[in-house]
Amino acid sequence: MVNELNVKEKMPTSGSVKKVVIFLHGYGADGADLFSLSDPLSEQLPDCFFASPDAPRKCGASPFGYEWFPIPDIDGSTIPDMMQALASSEKLIIKLIDGYKKRFGLDYSDIVLLGFSQGCMISLNIGLRQLNNLGGVVGILSLIHI
């Protein structure tokens, strides 16, 4: 199991952290994929810290990218493999959130998850089922089973 995430970070242009946005990339990508959004967003959100982790697992279908969990229909993994990896990734993301909360003296309501595709799936799962007091979840192009 991976214990830490490789994270790209950008401090706020104001120098004062009042909010955090965590980007969660899609299947087969990496943290750099969404991190480029931090430049235009920082102009509108000068007190916002941006973070973009790589998912913890190398992607079975894309040798240069990462995955939050395997997809059985794509890589031949099993549903239990997928669920175990999903739970493990969620724990790592919650650990990351808690770390920023402590580091910057923030509340959960000051932290937003922005996820694309598979990153959206895990963002919605965390935001709706585990940490429903987050500042928000922005989901782009995904789904969730309720």
Question: Positions of the model-derived regions?
Answer:
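Serine-hydrolase catalytic machinery in alpha/beta-hydrolase-like enzymes
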Residues: 2-106, 110
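Active-site signature of alpha/beta-hydrolase-fold catalytic machinery across serine-
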Residues: 36, 125-129
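Proline-centered flexible-loop/turn and helix-kink motifs
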Residues: 46, 131-132
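Residue-level signal for alpha-helix termini/capping positions
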Residues: 105, 128-131
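Short beta-strand immediately N-terminal to the catalytic nucleophile in serine-hydrolase-like folds
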Residues: 113-115, 140
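Gly/Ala-rich beta-loop-alpha elbow adjacent to hydrolase catalytic centers
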Residues: 115-119, 123
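A conserved short beta-strand
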Residues: 132-142
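Conserved small/polar residues in nucleotide/adenosyl-binding loops
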Residues: 144-146
